[in-house]
Amino acid sequence: MGKRLSDNLSSAYIDAANRLNGKRARRKIIAYVEAYDDIFFWRTVLSGFENEERYFEVMLPSRLNLTKGKRSVLMNLVSQNIGENMIACVDADYDYLLQETTPLSDEVINNPYVFHTYAYAIENLQCYAPSLHDVTVAVTLNDHSIFNFEEFLKLYSESIHPLFVWSIWHYRQGIHRRFTISDFNRVVEIGNFSLQGATESIQRLRHKVQMRVRQLQKENPNAKDSYLKLKDELRTLGVTPSTTYLYIQGHHLFDNIIVPVLKRVCDLLVREREDEINRNAVHDTQRRNELSSYGHSTEAIIPMLRRNVGYTNAEPFLRLKEDIYTFLNPPTQQPTD
């Protein structure tokens, strides 16, 4: 038994505390998340559902050591205690696409008090293609569109999609050690990226993927039917060839794909703005002052990307909001005769 009252928090305890506050007080719902970085995202999700009757408090289960297996720790903490007044908010990882083939996947999908991102992680939504131009503007204060992020990520996704299906296939079959997420990530890296060489980067990527797909086909000669069936099923779950990037490992997408591309784009946009200042300055003092002012006004890429909230129209995000709406507004049961 926990030594502190806070060690034994449950949905029922929060419900009792809510009732003690009186009928007119707003109902408090605790939302447990996995890490500090997740608090801002889930606050943006849940704040739209707050009203005169309820509010959310997003927090970590801080009494536990979250440095190892934090996701499993979170699930163990809340699986027995969650309810209408205490919910768990987690990254989907592969658990959504595994569709109950593991105990954790079953918990994530079927527990009505566990909410997940549908996309692999929050980072995937922060990298939502239609929002990335706005990120470059926030970083550089230059609204010149010099790179088509949506087309690039569409081509990237279409290139990696066949191999992604193989990745899920191995996890569904329980043989993921033969082709791990790390193995997949090594294949789908784009290497040293340049704006001028973007097309060549995609072509090299396709070649690497095709080679690995052929290898996996040889290693699994009887998998064709189950592979094609899984491919169709994944489409019904939202994984289309053009949106695959939303479902790969979030840290890999963020750190190794999107940030390097954003750096190339933002560097060029900054130079473009600085060249404009140099051309238009009337005298050297004005030039120095304008360059200094502009330099102090620009922002770092990673913090801006982590605070990007331009994913509100992304399909996974819309599905997440629908889940929360249903939780807060359960359908009324028709009386039985």
Can you describe what each PLM-predicted range is?
Residues 1-337:
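Acidic, divalent-metal-binding catalytic cores of TOPRIM
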